From Swiss-Prot:
Pfam families found in the cross-reference section: Insulin
InterPro entries per record: Insulin-like (IPR016179), Insulin-like_sf (IPR036438), Insulin_CS (IPR022353)
Family that this chain belongs to: Belongs to the insulin family.
Propeptide residues, chain positions: 22-29, 53-94
Gene3D superfamilies on file: Insulin-like
Tissues where this protein is expressed: Expressed by the venom gland.
Keyword GTP-binding carried by entry: no
BP term (GO), one: glucose metabolic process
Signal sequence coordinates: 1-21
Protein name: Con-Ins T2
Gene Ontology cellular component terms for the protein in this record: extracellular region
Protein's organism: Conus tulipa (Fish-hunting cone snail)
Length: 115
Protein backbone atom coordinates (compact mmCIF):
# COMPACT_ATOMS: atom_id res chain seq x y z
CA UNK A 1 0.00 0.00 0.00
CA UNK A 2 2.76 2.45 0.78
CA UNK A 3 4.54 1.78 -2.53
CA UNK A 4 1.43 2.60 -4.55
CA UNK A 5 0.87 5.71 -2.40
CA UNK A 6 4.40 7.00 -3.13
CA UNK A 7 3.99 6.18 -6.80
CA UNK A 8 0.74 8.18 -6.85
CA UNK A 9 2.43 11.14 -5.12
CA UNK A 10 5.31 11.14 -7.61
CA UNK A 11 2.88 10.89 -10.53
CA UNK A 12 0.81 13.80 -9.22
CA UNK A 13 3.95 15.86 -8.64
CA UNK A 14 5.14 15.26 -12.20
CA UNK A 15 1.71 16.10 -13.56
CA UNK A 16 1.64 19.34 -11.59
CA UNK A 17 5.12 20.25 -12.82
CA UNK A 18 4.19 19.64 -16.47
CA UNK A 19 0.97 21.66 -16.15
CA UNK A 20 2.72 24.56 -14.44
CA UNK A 21 5.52 24.74 -16.98
CA UNK A 22 3.19 24.60 -19.98
CA UNK A 23 0.72 27.19 -18.64
CA UNK A 24 3.44 29.43 -17.25
CA UNK A 25 4.88 30.09 -20.70
CA UNK A 26 1.58 31.36 -22.04
CA UNK A 27 1.92 34.80 -20.51
CA UNK A 28 5.55 35.50 -21.29
CA UNK A 29 6.36 37.49 -24.40
CA UNK A 30 9.35 37.01 -26.63
CA UNK A 31 10.93 40.35 -27.60
CA UNK A 32 10.54 39.47 -31.29
CA UNK A 33 6.84 38.62 -30.97
CA UNK A 34 4.68 41.36 -32.54
CA UNK A 35 2.10 42.93 -30.23
CA UNK A 36 -0.20 45.96 -30.25
CA UNK A 37 1.00 49.02 -28.33
CA UNK A 38 -1.47 51.83 -27.77
CA UNK A 39 -1.53 54.93 -25.59
CA UNK A 40 0.94 54.85 -22.72
CA UNK A 41 2.40 51.56 -23.99
CA UNK A 42 3.88 53.49 -26.95
CA UNK A 43 5.47 55.97 -24.55
CA UNK A 44 6.80 53.20 -22.32
CA UNK A 45 8.20 51.33 -25.31
CA UNK A 46 9.81 54.55 -26.58
CA UNK A 47 11.53 55.11 -23.23
CA UNK A 48 12.67 51.49 -23.03
CA UNK A 49 13.74 50.91 -26.64
CA UNK A 50 14.98 54.41 -27.56
CA UNK A 51 17.00 55.51 -24.49
CA UNK A 52 19.34 57.73 -26.53
CA UNK A 53 16.44 59.92 -27.72
CA UNK A 54 14.67 62.42 -25.51
CA UNK A 55 11.33 64.03 -26.17
CA UNK A 56 11.44 67.47 -24.59
CA UNK A 57 8.51 68.88 -26.57
CA UNK A 58 6.27 68.91 -23.51
CA UNK A 59 8.84 70.78 -21.44
CA UNK A 60 9.29 73.49 -24.06
CA UNK A 61 5.60 74.33 -24.44
CA UNK A 62 4.74 77.77 -23.23
CA UNK A 63 8.30 79.06 -23.48
CA UNK A 64 9.48 81.47 -26.14
CA UNK A 65 11.79 79.92 -28.66
CA UNK A 66 15.32 81.35 -28.77
CA UNK A 67 14.87 81.82 -32.53
CA UNK A 68 11.90 84.12 -32.03
CA UNK A 69 13.75 86.15 -29.39
CA UNK A 70 16.23 87.44 -31.96
CA UNK A 71 13.92 90.29 -32.85
CA UNK A 72 12.59 89.23 -36.24
CA UNK A 73 15.91 88.36 -37.84
CA UNK A 74 14.42 85.15 -39.23
CA UNK A 75 12.97 85.25 -42.68
CA UNK A 76 9.56 83.84 -43.44
CA UNK A 77 11.20 80.87 -45.17
CA UNK A 78 13.10 79.90 -42.04
CA UNK A 79 9.96 80.20 -39.94
CA UNK A 80 8.03 78.05 -42.41
CA UNK A 81 10.81 75.44 -42.41
CA UNK A 82 10.66 75.33 -38.61
CA UNK A 83 6.88 74.77 -38.75
CA UNK A 84 7.31 72.02 -41.33
CA UNK A 85 9.79 70.20 -39.06
CA UNK A 86 7.19 70.09 -36.30
CA UNK A 87 4.58 68.84 -38.77
CA UNK A 88 6.81 65.93 -39.83
CA UNK A 89 7.43 65.01 -36.19
CA UNK A 90 3.68 64.82 -35.61
CA UNK A 91 3.23 62.67 -38.71
CA UNK A 92 5.99 60.31 -37.54
CA UNK A 93 4.11 59.88 -34.24
CA UNK A 94 0.94 59.00 -36.13
CA UNK A 95 2.98 56.51 -38.13
CA UNK A 96 3.96 54.65 -34.99
CA UNK A 97 0.32 54.56 -33.90
CA UNK A 98 -0.78 53.33 -37.33
CA UNK A 99 1.96 50.72 -37.44
CA UNK A 100 2.07 49.47 -33.83
CA UNK A 101 -1.37 50.18 -32.34
CA UNK A 102 -3.77 49.34 -35.13
CA UNK A 103 -1.47 46.53 -36.28
CA UNK A 104 0.99 44.54 -34.18
CA UNK A 105 4.71 45.31 -34.39
CA UNK A 106 7.83 43.73 -32.89
CA UNK A 107 10.50 45.57 -30.92
CA UNK A 108 12.74 45.69 -34.00
CA UNK A 109 9.95 47.31 -36.03
CA UNK A 110 9.21 49.75 -33.21
CA UNK A 111 12.87 50.79 -33.01
CA UNK A 112 12.67 52.03 -36.61
CA UNK A 113 10.58 54.91 -35.27
CA UNK A 114 13.28 55.99 -32.79
CA UNK A 115 14.71 58.32 -35.45
Amino acid sequence: MTTSFYFLLVALGLLLYVCQSSFGNQHTRNSDTPWNRCGSQITDSYRELCPHKRNDAGKKRGQASPLWQRGGSLSMLKARAKRNEAFHLQRAHRGVVEHCCKRACSNAEFMQFCG
